[in-house]
């Protein structure tokens, strides 16, 4: 049986990573909206549905950014 070393949970850059993820998701929404005029009706519906899910993800990531920033401020992330 092999022994695995436990790596400490380094969350020091979570806020920055989440901010990058939000920005990338926003860019994906913008790019997909540019493609709407070239898409069939079925594809347009799929794009709209996917963008709705993307917006929900953005909201969740922003909530997590807030939580991580608060934790950092309170000294949990040094």
UniProtKB/Swiss-Prot annotation:
InterPro entries: SASP_thioredoxin-like
Pfam families assigned to the protein according to its UniProt record, in alphabetical order: Tlp (PF19824)
Places the protein is found: Spore core
Composition bias type Basic and acidic residues, residue spans: 45-78
Key words, A-Z: Sporulation
Stored NCBIfam families: SASP_tlp
Family the entry assigns: Belongs to the Tlp family.
Full protein name: Small, acid-soluble spore protein Tlp
Organism listed in the record: Bacillus licheniformis (strain ATCC 14580 / DSM 13 / JCM 2505 / CCUG 7422 / NBRC 12200 / NCIMB 9375 / NCTC 10341 / NRRL NRS-1264 / Gibson 46)
Gene coding for it: tlp
């Amino acid at each position: 049986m092999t022994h695995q070393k436990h790596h400490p949970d380094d969350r020091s850059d979570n806020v920055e990573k989440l901010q990058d993820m939000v920005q990338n998701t926003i860019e994906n929404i913008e790019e997909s909206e540019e493609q709407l005029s070239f898409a069939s009706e079925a594809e347009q519906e799929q794009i709209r549905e996917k963008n709705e899910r993307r917006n929900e993800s953005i909201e969740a990531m922003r909530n997590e950014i807030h939580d991580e920033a608060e934790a950092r401020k309170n000294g949990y992330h040094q």
